[in-house]
Amino acid sequence: MLRAGPMTLKFADGELRYLHAGGREIVRRIYFAVRDHRWDTAMPRFSVLRVEKGGDSFGIELAADCRTATADYSWRGRITGTAEGVLTFEADGVANRDFGSNRIGLCVLFGSDSLAGQTFATAGESGERAGEFPRLVAPALVAEKFRELRYTTASGVTVCAGMGGAVFDMEDQRNYGDSSFKAYAPLPYAYPAVAAGSSASQILRLAVEGAARAPLGAAETRVRIGGIIAGARIPKLAETAPGTREVDFFAVNTHRAAHAAVRRLQFAFNPALHLPDDDTFMENPSALPDMVRTARIIAPGAAIRIDPITFDSQHPRPARDPRNASQFGAVWSALVVKYLALAGVGEAAFAIDGGPARAVLRELAAFAGCAVRETVVAAEGRAPVEALAIDDGPGVRLWLMNTTDLPQRVLLADGDVFTPLELAPHEIWRGNRAR
């Protein structure tokens, strides 16, 4: 964990993740992206990676080479965080060969589950404009051509993000199953040719106001069960039938008139389009309730079915993800079922063939139609454990899911008494509680 005054954050794989201030997430992620003309992501290989950590500040230097079959790009970065709550990310890059690219540069993700409904203001080439992080999934850009973005979180912390070296647009990534809004620098035209030796520089400056320096919290996660959530039930679960046509939500959201009168609306959930890391995959199921709420606006009264559900890569080429066969796949599947239940989805089908995941889905399928209770999960930063409480007859079935590859300590509340639990990496803990 790194700190910049009142701001705390995680640094992993050359990225800044889960920036928190004032007890809430203010930015989901900041990273440098290189994608070729087929949207294939050139994953960075770091030759320099130095982190200097102070009590209230930090400094990072990094250098990366990004290559695909056609792309070859190198960049150097300098990241600093000060005790005054100011973060700066500078990046200088150069193309090592001619290649076609869809994206090169800094990207900033803003969590939809923490910022949806909050207002913002942008400043740029078209002057100042007011907007809102949308609650429903936006089919068009959320903001365009800006160099500065300013917003206030629900806890009263003001965040100002200034971008240099390019103008930025912001899209709603929930269209693709990601639980975020993404600010990025669009390239000037489709599939531009990047010439060997061409260089570019970008800088992001992020400052927070109105956030006190909070002490680092305890290492454990606290979980408490609440009351039944109206309309939340475990859906009927099945396996995706061979040959099922995959319709992505973006196609539904951008062609609303074609779906307005349907009696049954089916779309896929596959969050593998953008970032493939473990953190991203565990974040993205929380986008499902917003996607379903939007679908119900598009097709009022229609039965909603999510099918297929998978995290196998489909673009730029289909590929089976090896995490299907691991305990990671089991936790991810249980997490998806939780958010399907919160969304009130009636039916869902999975295209995941790993043994642990299939066992979990068979177990959860037995609870189809059961009500779901509220669970309150409290942790320092982003909670590493998720909870699912199923109202089943005389009692409550509680599932605790460790979404990380590290052991986690949990304190489970029963009134004023807390029971300590230790969860192994990607463990699903099951227990019963009286109503």
Where are each of the predicted segments found?
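Carbohydrate-binding surface patches
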Residues: 379-415
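Aromatic/acidic polysaccharide-binding cleft in carbohydrate-active enzymes
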Residues: 305-365, 377-379
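Beta-strand-rich recognition/accessory modules
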Residues: 3, 31, 65-69, 150-228
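Polysaccharide-binding surfaces and accessory modules of carbohydrate-active proteins
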Residues: 80-167, 426
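Noncatalytic carbohydrate-binding groove/subsite architecture in carbohydrate-active enzymes
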Residues: 241-326
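Catalytic domains of carbohydrate-active enzymes, especially glycoside hydrolases
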Residues: 219, 228-240
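C-terminal beta-strand-rich structural cap/linker in extracellular carbohydrate-active enzymes
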Residues: 421-435
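Acidic-aromatic substrate-binding/catalytic surfaces of carbohydrate-active enzymes
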Residues: 1-65, 119, 126
